[in-house]
């Protein structure tokens, strides 16, 4: 292991001890924001510290095994060889693990998200598929213990959605779903197809981290135009009685957001402003990623909505992620929310990409 990495790890261990002490102080416990931020930092440092302690122990075991090789007892020498082999394997594994743990963290990884699914080419079938995608992400969120709420929805004429925007909140939502942005293509025989022909449709998915005050996304009130209108669609007795739905236009960028799912105009406005901040934050992230991709190839993390990232082929029961050439014949399970078999390989590919960049530098 490089001396620079060891020095970095030593400084993180010292910081871990410092944060641990701070979390026990009365003035920190009484300040919810400070306590929350320090708790997050502690939980991030904990696995690094544990892995480094294990690594240090493996180095000590290796040294002890080397000394035992000089013993005259053949049985002890054989035991030393086994311990040396085990220690070397542990050292190799932990060096790889520590490299991953030391990768620069995406500052938005802990963020909640806005998930936007929009029907593309394919007419009614695209709308139906956008509904299927929403169910897939809803079931995945449920499995992870996250909460999901609809912010805005425009229903398709024969089911599904022309567009649906939801908010998903919980632990590490953005870190798991950030690579879902892009064009999702479906190949299947629609229920209305009498000839049994396979149709191809597409939906676009956008995953945006929910921007809060710490992101520094400040919106000048003079830069927005707020319109009210009557909510449409499902909603029972409250629908069309009052102009509670809100549309906000950000004049400098032309970004438009709507919210009509909440019962009051005040709540809809707050939700729409939060969504607008997230869209502006995502635009900034997209800009940074484009600048990075100009200097290096990043297959996984481009987040370009027009890029076809995945195909769902129903006749073959196949799902293919084109960015990492991953094909799984378990489409039914995936559509029921079993997404980890796709998401985890994407995360590993992204980590490998970051490691390659660090070694190039």
Swiss-Prot record:
InterPro entries: PCRF, Pep_chain_release_fac_I, Pep_chain_release_fac_I_sf, Prokaryotic/Mito_RF, RF-1. Residues 287-307 are annotated as: Disordered. It comes from the Bacteria. One of its GO terms (molecular function) is translation release factor activity, codon specific. SUPFAM superfamilies: Release factor. It holds the Pfam family RF-1. Peptide chain release factor 1 directs the termination of translation in response to the peptide chain termination codons UAG and UAA. HAMAP family: Rel_fac_1. This is Peptide chain release factor 1. It comes from Francisella philomiragia subsp. philomiragia (strain ATCC 25017 / CCUG 19701 / FSC 153 / O#319-036).
């Amino acid at each position: 292991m490089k001396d620079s990495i060891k020095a970095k790890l030593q400084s993180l261990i010292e910081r871990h001890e410092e944060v641990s002490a701070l979390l026990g102080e009365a003035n920190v416990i009484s300040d919810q924001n400070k306590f929350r931020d320090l708790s997050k930092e502690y939980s991030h440092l904990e696995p690094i510290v544990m892995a480094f302690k294990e690594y240090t122990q493996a180095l000590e075991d290796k040294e002890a095994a080397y000394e035992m090789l000089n013993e005259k007892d053949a049985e002890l020498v054989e035991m030393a060889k086994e311990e040396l082999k085990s220690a070397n394997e542990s050292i190799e594994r932990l060096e790889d693990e520590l490299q991953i743990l030391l990768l620069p963290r995406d500052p938005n990884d802990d963020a909640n998200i806005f998930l936007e699914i929009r029907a593309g080419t394919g007419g009614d079938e695209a709308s139906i598929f956008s509904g299927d995608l929403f169910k897939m992400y809803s079931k995945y969120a449920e499995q992870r213990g996250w909460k999901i709420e609809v912010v805005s929805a425009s229903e398709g004429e024969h089911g599904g959605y022309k567009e649906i925007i939801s908010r998903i909140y919980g632990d590490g939502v953005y870190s798991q779903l950030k690579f879902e942005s892009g064009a999702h293509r479906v190949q299947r025989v629609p229920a209305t197809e009498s000839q049994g022909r396979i149709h191809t449709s597409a939906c676009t998915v956008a995953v945006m981290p929910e921007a809060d005050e710490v992101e520094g996304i400040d919106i000048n009130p003079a830069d927005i135009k707020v319109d009210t209108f009557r909510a449409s669609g499902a909603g029972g007795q409250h629908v069309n009685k009052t102009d509670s739905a809100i549309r906000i236009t950000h004049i400098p960028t032309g970004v438009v957001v709507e919210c009509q799912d909440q019962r009051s105009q005040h709540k809809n406005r707050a939700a729409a402003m939060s969504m607008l901040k997230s869209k502006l934050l995502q635009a900034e992230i997209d800009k940074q990623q484009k600048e990075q991709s100009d200097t290096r190839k990043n297959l996984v993390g481009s987040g370009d909505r027009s890029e076809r990232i995945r195909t769902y082929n129903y006749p073959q029961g196949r799902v293919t992620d084109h960015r990492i050439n991953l094909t799984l014949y378990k489409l039914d399970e995936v559509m029921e929310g079993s997404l980890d078999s796709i998401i985890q390989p994407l995360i590993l590919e992204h980590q490998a990409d970051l490691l390659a960049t660090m070694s190039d530098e």
